[in-house]
Amino acid sequence: MSRFRIPGAGRLSPARPLRFTFDGRTYSGLEGDTLASALIANGVHLVGRSFKYHRPRGFLSAGAEEPSALVGIRRDATRQTPNVRATVQELYDGLAAISQNRWPALSFDVGAVNDLAAPLFSAGFYYKTFMWPRKAWKYLYEPAIRASAGLGVAPKEADPDRYAARFAHCDVLVVGGGAAGLSAALAAAESGASVVLADEQAEFGGSLRFESGAVIDGRLGWDWAQGAAARLAAMPNVRLLTRTTAFGYYTQNILGLAERLTDHLAAPDPAAPRERLWQIRAKRVVLATGAIERHMVFPGNDRPGVMLASAGRTWLNHHGAAVGSAVGVFAANDSGWLAALDLAKAGVRVAAIVDTRPAAGEEVTQAARAAGIEVLTGHTVTRTDGRLRIGSMTVRPVSGGGSARRIAVDALLMSAGWTPSLHLFSQSRGKVAFDEATQRFLPGQYAQDCACVGACNGTESLAAAVAEGFAAGEAAGREARKGLAKSPPPLTPPHKGEGDSAAPTTPSPLWGGVRGGGIAASGGGRPPAVDASEPCSGGALGDAAGGVKGRAFVDFQNDVTSKDIRQAVREGMRSIEHVKRFTTNGMATDQGKTSNLHGLAIAAQALGKPIPQVGLTTFRPPYTPVTFGTIVGHARGPLFDPTRRTTTHAWATRHGAVFEDVGQWKRAWYFPRAGEDMHAAVARECRTVRQAAGVFDASTLGKIEVVGPDAAAFMELIYTNPWQKLEPGRCRYGLMLREDGFIYDDGVVGRLAEDRFHVTTTTGGAARVLNQMEDYLQTEFPHLKVWLTSVSEQWAVIAVQGPKSRDIIAPLVEGIDVSDAAMPHMSVREGTICGVPTRLFRMSFTGERGFEINVPADYGEAVWEAVWAEAQKHGACAYGTEAMHVLRAEKGYIIVGQETDGTVTPDDVGLAWAIGKGK
């Protein structure tokens, strides 16, 4: 048993031990541990170094918001993942983790010299330092800064793992599997709706993981959660996704989710995907994403062993591990007191509870005194001491000028309240609203079909969260199923029992602050008075009494202090986005989950403005880091860019063609005979086309059908040429320009009927021309009745060019007179060739007589074989793209993208004649 593992505490079984290593040293853990909880159980708090100053860092949280405990995970030489949050990584037997951003060792890091040079690296230092001598930047400063940048080391080997992707749709998607989320999923599922419930943890339960006294429906909260999950798993209309993070909320209720499939396994199946990307469209979304506990901002708050109260409770109540043997608690709300009571109940000595408020809740105060815990209300922590882990804290009264007192501790739990997790809500384009009474942002105006429930909605009690989740789930399910099925009977929501904790899920902290300090929460319904000119005013946190000073950290990973944020304001930053970039607050891998609101409050205080007027930084996806492999999926290596082949590719291969890449297409470049190099082969092909005939695969050209009563009017608006008077059965060269008048694309257009055009584009322009047509049709000309359909891959195109081209195709076509009188140049006819339906174009890209045979792609190779057999009778040859380029250049025909570069007008290339006189 690890020395900080408490027998009988937690929910893990000691009968399932696991072995793992951290920085080469072997430790033991239990099945169900995270790497963080296992290290805590072994008394290990130092796990990393901060980004800028290389200060010792421990754990701050027990969840995805963790900014400090980033490690590298190594399975083998090819499987190394940097910047993994130890609080999320599940333990497995043989796990090997290494600390990051240190040299030569974690306990002795040469980079810590940066901490001594901290004045050189203050906020915005990159704008103000390393400016002299000028040449030193290129040869000294920049190389040194770049060499020291970053945290983990990216793997150098190719990723050997597989990744998967799935698309899904459902009536109701519930994000978050805590009490509110489970309740919402149950209600929605029982209404008959199809439901997807996703949670980033390995098990459902959310905050019930650490709420030891919660009771729902007469059962302990955690037991109720597992029972609810089992009920949902048994329902055919429910899909449960654990270890799945909803990282992005996009338009039309599409959410991106990353499911971790094998990172928790000791020996994963090499054929199984490591992660899966889900893209889910839901009729209704219920966000039950919870809240993130706020840390206190005071000097020395970054020392290993100083952590959030919820982290200490999670590791104690779920994993059975104590964070120390003499634990201090620093709080501004009752959540910290609950952590102290849980520790005391488990037999861990609580050195003291320090609370900035004049008084805490009566129930928790009485319980603390009954447990023999020293209570110091109206006090604050002014500093901590200890080299690689906290060894003591110094406290003093908030006001009244009392003397400072030093208390020995080996861990310090802190809690300044809770911040609703609104990242996904904001990504959905929802507008947040600032609640003055509780000094926090809450969901305001909704932009999509979603609802926020529980702690992320600011709901403060477990009972209210369960009821709110149930109501939202039932409403979402009924609305999504409206008119599709018989309405189910009224549902009965879960009932919260009497054993639940009395503390609200989301307390109501209020901000305060002074010179050099940060943020404190205070009771009383309104913020304390603040006098920024005095170091000890209003119960705020700042410089310690007696002139002792220290740095109070806001962003633990990027080493941003409260002083840095005030400095940014002094140097002219007024927008919170400017403050963010000047200080790098909230720009670390955690994207400011624990630091954004603190930085905002300090900046608002420095500016003398209310928090809402300063603004809120933009929440962008992903919510937490997502591996490149998850995003890329199968699209790598040969599958990164699809290789497209025409129907004659196999034939060309058999006949010795040399291929070239044209966009995604493999095209026959030339057909060398024995002893020929490219120049000889191309010269022969060109000569044969001029003297007899040649057969060429032109299937890669883009093909778009423009159909509808307004098709001709639409063509007039898209192309420079006139189209209204073009008769069915005739073709015309079409020129398309950008809005600035430069050439965009070209091609031959055949009018098949009054309301139907067969449009060809360049090979490279097929997709972009269709997109531009669609864009204009939907935004500029929505009144036109026109339908656009890409048929590029539906038609194989065989070009027969040369003086004998008519002799080659005449015996093969049925129902089409190919004489000059019946089918003049620039004509199109429909009939059959070799019994296959065809659109036959009389056109040329060589200057010789030519025909282009369009047949359904499935028949392309068969028709080609028939044409080739006939062509050989007339001395024709197959030719490739190189000969095509020579032949068209000899006649002065342009290719968009070769004779044009985006700055060429029609007149520049002799195409002024293609512009209609009335345009």
Q: What is the predicted role of each segment?
A:
Residues 493, 497-498, 511-516:
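Glycine-biased, low-complexity coil/linker segments
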